């Protein structure tokens, strides 16, 4: 991808194995289009390269999904900063603010529900395409305050990173938002993503970091949360995967109901009209004239 110019570094992992740059095409002075270029490497053997390609190809199937950042291209065997055989992924650059930095206390309750609904629908589309995120957390959710658009980033790349990171003894999970089975090093499933979404919903609604199932449930009890909301989040973040929702469709239905219940209702008045009395009134009015 020599035809792209690096504008700035957006992110660099602690090990330095993953770097994200903001880039633009060279020799296109009139074009303001920018992209995100993710470098992952080195891919030291055939197995790592095969897994990298398989994962990126799977993620490209999400390009038609709403709310998910799109992959434009990728390269194997790239050279960067003295490293050979690096993997490069070119993605759409997503503006806005990540959810970790959004002023959620400025949102109304219904706006918070609508935000969660957009996130859930994006992840549902991915699940319907047999792709898991594996690292759902506020910093991987971008929000545009003006357009209210939501974009999920870093989609599925936690598995790619786990293939190439040198410090393989480090667990790949996010504090506060990963499911218990993921923290223990077990396989990620749809139920694991649903746990993370429940933790994100708790973060959005209550503006505090979740810290495990017990803390989430106790906080909701202490705050007098409504039964429907408490039951929803509690089931999403259940300790055991089998006790959670196994798909997002029922979660989305409940959130849509919550939005409907919280929307201000316009007053509607029903009345019946006696036509004979109306005609009599008209006659009396005319006679008075």
Residue ranges and their predicted role:
Residues 82-97:
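Conserved short submotifs of the Hanks-type protein kinase catalytic core
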Residues 193:
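Conserved catalytic-loop aspartate of Hanks-type protein kinases
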Residues 263-289:
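Regulatory extensions appended to serine/threonine kinase catalytic cores
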Residues 127-143:
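Catalytic-loop of the protein kinase fold
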Residues 168-182:
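Conserved activation segment of eukaryotic-like protein kinases, specifically the C-terminal portion
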Residues 44-61:
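AlphaC helix of the eukaryotic protein kinase fold
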Residues 115-116:
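Activation segment signature within eukaryotic-like protein kinase domains
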Residues 64-76:
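Conserved HxN/HPN-centered segment at the entrance to the catalytic loop
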